[in-house]
């Protein structure tokens, strides 16, 4: 048996930067769903899942752009789109044009893990990743020698953990918003470590009442009802009223 060094802590002995507990606000209704203090908390991780075509990328870019417009340093890491694809988004949502974006397709001949490490080391308040599966595949494909998907995911989660703890140049506790795929049955697809590292899990789906956004898990509290939304308005997602979870078909 290998002897493992076990460490226990007492919370009264730990000290954190007060800024860690100040929410990042978009100034819109969705803030109340991310935390009981109305906003996205620093140093957290959120998985985003939902029906195909429901608007996961659009909604999360809208949230990211609103954070950016209120002074947060944000980054979009896209493993799904290229700059031509993104141009179409910007025509409909001009505020997306101001977002710093790392297109992983521009670095397909380089080591993707090192590329992500190099950009994250700057220090960011909030990073949106679309999608975890594509980033994992990119890391696997560009690593010298063989790397399993489990190992690739683990390396990415290690990065999340380091930057959650502000291990970057600006010592910022980074929040990660991670768009994640589900199985054909609609179940969450991911390792136990991924699930445990997620502060919360947000869902978007089509219902007879319209598109909804809700959390099935959120360690930071927040509104438990589902928030209706639509993509009709120009340059912003339209957040509407709420539905109790027992009213959703």
Regions found by a protein language model. Give the residues of each.
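N-terminal pre-Walker A segment at the start of P-loop NTPase domains
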Residues: 4-34
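Phosphate-binding P-loop
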Residues: 35-43
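Conserved P-loop
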Residues: 42-114
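Short, well-ordered alpha-helix to beta-strand connector turns
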Residues: 43, 71, 124, 198-199
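Short acidic, S/G/P-rich loop/turn micro-motifs used as interaction or catalytic elements
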Residues: 54, 82, 108-109, 133-139, ...
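Conserved beta-strand segments of the P-loop GTPase G domain that flank and frequently precede/overlap
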Residues: 76-78, 102-104, 129-130, 177-181, ...
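Phosphate-binding/switch loop-helix module in NTP-utilizing enzymes
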Residues: 105-173
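Phosphate-binding/switch region of NTP-binding enzymes
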Residues: 158-249
């Amino acid at each position: 048996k290998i002897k493992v060094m076990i460490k226990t802590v007492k919370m009264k002995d730990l000290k954190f930067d007060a800024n860690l507990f100040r929410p990042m606000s978009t100034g819109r209704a969705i803030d109340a769903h991310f935390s009981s203090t109305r906003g996205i908390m620093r140093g957290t991780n959120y998985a985003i899942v939902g029906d195909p075509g429901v608007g996961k990328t659009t909604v999360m870019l809208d949230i990211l752009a609103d954070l950016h417009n209120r002074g947060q340093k944000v980054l979009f890491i896209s493993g799904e789109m290229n700059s031509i694809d993104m141009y179409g988004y910007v025509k409909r949502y001009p505020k997306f044009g101001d977002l710093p974006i790392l297109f992983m397709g521009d670095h397909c001949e380089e080591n993707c893990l090192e590329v992500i490490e190099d950009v994250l080391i700057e220090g960011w308040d909030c990073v949106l990743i679309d999608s975890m599966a594509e980033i994992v595949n990119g890391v696997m494909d560009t690593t010298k020698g063989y790397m399993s998907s489990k190992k690739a995911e683990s390396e990415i989660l290690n990065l999340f953990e380091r930057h959650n703890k502000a291990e970057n140049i600006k010592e910022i506790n980074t929040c990660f918003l991670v768009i994640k795929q589900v199985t054909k049955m609609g179940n969450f697809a991911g390792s136990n470590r991924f699930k445990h590292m997620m502060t919360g899990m947000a869902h978007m789906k089509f219902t007879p009442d319209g598109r909804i956004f809700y959390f099935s898990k959120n360690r930071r509290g927040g509104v438990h009802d589902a928030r209706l939304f639509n993509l009709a308005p120009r340059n912003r997602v339209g957040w509407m009223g709420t539905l109790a979870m027992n009213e959703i078909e």
